[in-house]
Design a protein with these regions (language model features):
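A conserved regulatory-domain signal marking ACT and ACT-like small-molecule sensing domains
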Residues: 1-89
Length: 89
């Protein structure tokens, strides 16, 4: 299964490292990454492969929410089909 991880918030050092570390610890492969900083506002979308995930999806969402709270960010995980449907005109 593939999914998208979206990260939003004020820019600071270490955001990509912290999010990637959580994913790596759970054996999740990052397929693609796009990040932008506009007027100190950080946005990132990661396309990830959950084929080898070592925990339940709900537990992954909780782990990323905890990281988001620590960094004052919003982090969301969405199944690829849902993300694609939401972003198709």
């Amino acid at each position: 299964m593939k999914a998208f991880v979206s990260v939003l918030g004020m820019d600071k050092k270490g955001i990509i490292k912290e999010v990637a570390s959580v994913l790596s610890e759970k054996d999740i492969n990052i397929l693609d990454i796009n990040q932008t900083i506009v007027d100190n506002y950080f946005t990132m979308v990661m396309h990830v492969d959950l084929s080898d995930i070592t925990i339940e999806l709900g537990a992954l969402k909780s782990a990323l929410n905890k990281t988001g709270e620590q960094l004052h960010l919003k982090i969301r995980v969405q199944h690829e089909a849902i993300f694609t449907a939401m972003h198709t005109i």
